[in-house]
């Protein structure tokens, strides 16, 4: 983990309220595990006070750049959406434990399941898995056609299936419907998205190796404030800190 300034190289809207930002700086050189995140100070003032956790979508160490994708949903991300090329951002990262891309053997098949703003970290994951000789299948869920992003980008690494709640793009319904209707075969699931989606995957595939990236509100980002705790299967009183112990967990470790 490092703390430093990163320079905004580009910032553009790629879907409804969805922005893609490229950041350049030394922190990119120590990014590696897919699924980690950056903790970004969005303003030089005290408002908003807390940093914003944004997952890393793509890592380019040679260019010292990382790409983040975020949804404009609140004052913090609104301010972030206004950043221009050349602006400097105070960044802490990379933080958290990512997906174990190295755990899958060459020739195995990974099913990558993303929901909404949980889609971005799966892009770097898919890239790394493909480079290791692992086959990737992508199932991406969105509310509507206007919310869909990175469908074409993911197709570079394997098959892509899109589901929308209203049926305006791809299949109508949930990501779990696509998996069953298409009869997808896989060795492992790696997913990021809203809790109901993660819970459904955990319940439907108890015999599969399933890794889940949790979406929780965070305060400090380093495990000190206890704002992002998640209960575990071990007992009602045991918990993990999503920012420090996660955000990626084995499905059987966490209580959803």
Swiss-Prot record:
InterPro entries, alphabetized: Cyt_c3_hydrogenase_gsu, Dihydroorotate_DH_ele_sf, Dihydroorotate_DH_Fe-S-bd, Dihydroorotate_DHASE_ETsu, FAD-bd_FR_type, FNR_nucleotide-bd, OxRdtase_FAD/NAD-bd, PyrK_electron_transfer
Positions of [2Fe-2S] cluster binding: 220, 225, 228, 243
Pathway: Pyrimidine metabolism; UMP biosynthesis via de novo pathway; orotate from (S)-dihydroorotate (NAD(+) route): step 1/1
GO biological process: 'de novo' UMP biosynthetic process
One Pfam family hit: NAD_binding_1
Record keywords, A-Z: 2Fe-2S, Electron transport, FAD, Flavoprotein, Iron, Iron-sulfur, Metal-binding, Pyrimidine biosynthesis, Transport
Keyword set includes Oxidoreductase: no
Domain of life: Bacteria
Cofactor(s) in the UniProt record: [2Fe-2S] cluster; FAD
Binding, FAD: 52-55, 69-71, 76-77
Cofactor mode of binding and number, as noted: Binds 1 [2Fe-2S] cluster per subunit.
GO terms of molecular function: 2 iron, 2 sulfur cluster binding; electron transfer activity; flavin adenine dinucleotide binding; metal ion binding; oxidoreductase activity
Location of the FAD-binding FR-type domain: 1-101
Family recorded in the similarity comment: Belongs to the PyrK family.
HAMAP family assigned: DHODB_Fe_S_bind
Function in brief: Responsible for channeling the electrons from the oxidation of dihydroorotate from the FMN redox center in the PyrD type B subunit to the ultimate electron acceptor NAD(+).
Subunit structure: Heterotetramer of 2 PyrK and 2 PyrD type B subunits.
Family matches, as NCBIfam families: PRK00054.1-2, PRK00054.1-4
Name the UniProt record assigns to this protein: Dihydroorotate dehydrogenase B (NAD(+)), electron transfer subunit
Protein's organism: Bacillus licheniformis (strain ATCC 14580 / DSM 13 / JCM 2505 / CCUG 7422 / NBRC 12200 / NCIMB 9375 / NCTC 10341 / NRRL NRS-1264 / Gibson 46)
Lineage summary: Bacteria, Bacillati, Bacillota, Bacilli, Bacillales
Gene that encodes it: pyrK
């Amino acid at each position: 983990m490092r703390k430093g300034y990163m320079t905004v190289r580009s910032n553009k809207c790629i879907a409804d309220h969805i922005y893609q930002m490229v950041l350049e700086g030394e922190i990119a050189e120590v990014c590696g595990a897919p699924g980690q995140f950056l903790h970004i100070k969005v303003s030089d003032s005290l408002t908003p006070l807390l940093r914003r956790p944004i997952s890393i979508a793509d890592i380019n160490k040679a260019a010292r750049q990382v790409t983040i994708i975020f949804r404009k949903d609140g004052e913090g991300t609104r301010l972030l959406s206004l950043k221009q090329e050349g602006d400097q951002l105070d960044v802490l990262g990379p933080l958290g434990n990512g997906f174990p891309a190295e755990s899958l053997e060459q020739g195995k098949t990974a099913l990558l399941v993303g929901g909404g703003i949980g889609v971005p970290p799966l892009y770097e994951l898919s890239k790394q898995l493909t480079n290791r000789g692992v086959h990737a299948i992508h199932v991406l869920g969105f509310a509507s056609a206007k919310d869909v992003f990175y469908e074409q980008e993911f197709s570079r690494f394997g098959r892509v299936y899109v589901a929308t709640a209203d049926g305006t793009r791809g299949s109508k319904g949930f990501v779990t419907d696509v998996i069953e209707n298409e009869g997808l075969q896989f060795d492992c699931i790696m997913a990021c998205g809203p809790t109901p989606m993660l819970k459904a995957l955990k319940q439907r595939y108890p015999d599969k190796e399933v890794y889940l990236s949790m979406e929780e509100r965070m305060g400090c980002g380093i495990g000190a404030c206890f704002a992002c705790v998640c209960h575990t299967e071990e007992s009602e009183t045991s918990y993990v800190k999503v920012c420090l112990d996660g955000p990626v967990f084995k499905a059987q470790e966490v209580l959803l």
